[in-house]
Structures are given as C-alpha cells and as structure tokens.
C-alpha cells in the first residue's frame, strides 16, 4: 500500500453539517476502495490565495491515508463530479525520506486533533 495525503477545499457557502457530511463521504470513498485512513485534519474556513469560482474563502480538509493506486483514481473522479469541491490535491509519498516526512505529518495531525492511533482506527471501523 502506498502513502498519500489529500487536501480538498469545499465551498464556504455550505453549512457546518453539510461540510461534515461531504468530509465523511470522502472518507467513505477512500475506505470503500481499499484505503485506510491514518489521520485527518479540519483546517476550517480560510482565505484563498485567489478567487476560485467567485469564492474568496474555502473550508479546508486534509486526509492522510494508505491505499492501492486505484483508490486515488476513484477519489479524484469523485472530487471532479462533486460540485461542492472547488479545489483538490493528492500527493503520493514514495521514497523513504518522503514516507518518514509523511509519518511526522500524521503524528502532528493526530496531536492537533487529539486522536491516538487506536482512536483513529476505531473511528474508521465505525464508519464502515
């Protein structure tokens, strides 16, 4: 399994419930296609560097996960057809140096969200 990080930006016009529902939907897509979510980060609503689709702000989310390569293809297909996603980026970590950096980012994300590794796995299992 390969190591990935995906960041996506949702429209700021969505309510908190709608944003959380889209976030959960994206997590389900990853899990249903053979991926395992390691950590997540909700960065909240932030100002965009430049207007996208006439929006100046967006709700940012990051998901760190391991998955086979076909999962990313399906995930990006879903991003493209979901109207509420205004921008996305998926990064694959390949070298040992990249993977160790990925692991450090995962630990930082877990500390910020207050999750331990076992809590993240329990949450992932509950959502399946």
UniProtKB/Swiss-Prot annotation:
Q: Give the matching Gene3D superfamilies.
A: 3.30.70.60
Q: Which UniProt keywords apply?
A: Ribonucleoprotein, Ribosomal protein, RNA-binding, rRNA-binding
Q: Which GO terms describe its biological process?
A: translation
InterPro entries given for it? Ribosomal_bS6, Ribosomal_bS6_sf, Ribosomal_S6_plastid/chlpt, Transl_elong_EF1B/ribsomal_bS6
One function term, GO molecular function aspect: small ribosomal subunit rRNA binding
List the GO terms this entry assigns under cellular component, sorted alphabetically.
Answer: cytosolic small ribosomal subunit
Record bears the keyword RNA-binding: yes
Query: Does the UniProt entry include the keyword Iron-sulfur?
Result: no
SUPFAM superfamilies cross-referenced by the UniProt entry: Ribosomal protein S6 (SSF54995)
Similarity comment text for this entry = Belongs to the bacterial ribosomal protein bS6 family.
PANTHER family, alphabetized: MITOCHONDRIAL 28S RIBOSOMAL PROTEIN S6, SMALL RIBOSOMAL SUBUNIT PROTEIN BS6M
Primary role: Binds together with bS18 to 16S ribosomal RNA.
State the name under which the record lists this protein. Answer: Small ribosomal subunit protein bS6
Q: What is the lineage of its organism?
A: Bacteria, Pseudomonadati, Campylobacterota, Epsilonproteobacteria, Nautiliales
């Amino acid at each position: 399994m390969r190591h990935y990080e995906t960041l996506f930006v949702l429209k700021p016009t969505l309510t908190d419930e709608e944003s959380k529902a889209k976030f959960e939907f994206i997590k389900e897509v990853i899990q249903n296609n053979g991926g395992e979510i390691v950590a997540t980060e909700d960065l909240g609503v932030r100002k965009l560097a430049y207007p996208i689709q006439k929006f100046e702000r967006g709700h940012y989310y990051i998901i760190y996960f391991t998955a086979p390569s076909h999962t990313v293809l399906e995930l990006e297909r879903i991003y493209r057809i979901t109207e509420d996603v205004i921008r996305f980026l998926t990064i694959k970590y390949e070298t040992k140096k990249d993977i160790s950096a990925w692991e450090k980012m995962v630990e930082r994300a877990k500390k910020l969200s207050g999750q331990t590794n076992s809590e993240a796995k329990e949450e992932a299992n509950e959502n399946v």
